[in-house]
Amino acid sequence: MTTPTAPAHEADAERRHEHRFQVSESIARLVMRTTANNLPLSRDDRPYQWSTTTYCDTLSWSIFRAAEKGSAMQLRIREYHRTRPREVLNPGTAWIEFKDDEQDTSLKERFGVPMDVARSFLRGSTTLPDPEHGLAERAVRLLRDGARPVAVTQYNRLAYNSLDSSLRITADHNLMYFALPWESRGDAGETPSPLGSLLSMEPDVIVEMKWYGDLPHWAVDLHAYLKENTREERPSKFIVAMRWLLGETDGTRKPKKK
C-alpha cells in the first residue's frame, strides 16, 4: 500500500559536514550567543521544544555496528512536543527520517506523515516516495531485515539556520537516552508505547555544526573555539544511545574494552 496523500518532504541538497561537541552550559551559552548574532532562529525548531527520536536497529545490531565503523544508514521516527512526553509514537505528526552517515558527513531525507502512517511504514505495510537519494529504498531493506524501534532520545533543542540552509548550528539540552520495552518493537496495536528504562542523562550540552561548502569566517573561528574546549569529537546520539543500551560504555566518550 502507498500513502494516499503526498507527505511533507525535506531532503539535503548534497552531503554536508557534521561535527558534534560536548560542552559545558557556559560555553554553550557563549557559542549560541555568537550564533544568534549571525544566523536567524530556525523556523522549524522552536527554542527549547522537546524533540523525541526513536531509533531502529536489527536483531544483530547491524546499523549500530556499521555506525561504529563510520558508515551507516539510520532509520528513525522524530516527534516534536511542547512538554516532554512519557511515551513514543504518539498520535499527531511524525517525521520518518533516513540519514546516511559517512565519516564526518551526512545526507538526510525525511517525510512528515500522520503517526498511523509511520507505524504502518515500520510494519512494511506502507511505502513512501523515493525521489531524491534512494534512502527510502534502503530503509525498506532494513525493515525487511528486521529493523525495529530499540532506543529513544529526548532533548530540548535550540537551532539557528542560514536562510539558504548551508549552515545549521544547534544546542541540545537535557539530553536523555531511553531503552524501549520489547513489546514496543513489534506490530502490536496503534497506541503510544511507554518509554523504558532511563539509560543515561547527559550532564552537558551537545552542540552540532552542519554545513555545505565553506564556512563563513565567524563560523570558522567558532568551530576552532569548540575544538579547543572539547577533548574529542562527540559520537552521534544514535551511537551513544546504543552503547548505553548494550552496556558497551563506561560513559559517553569511551567504549568498554573487550
Regions found by a protein language model. Name each.
Residues 1-258:
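Phosphate-end processing signature that detects enzymes handling 5′-triphosphorylated RNA
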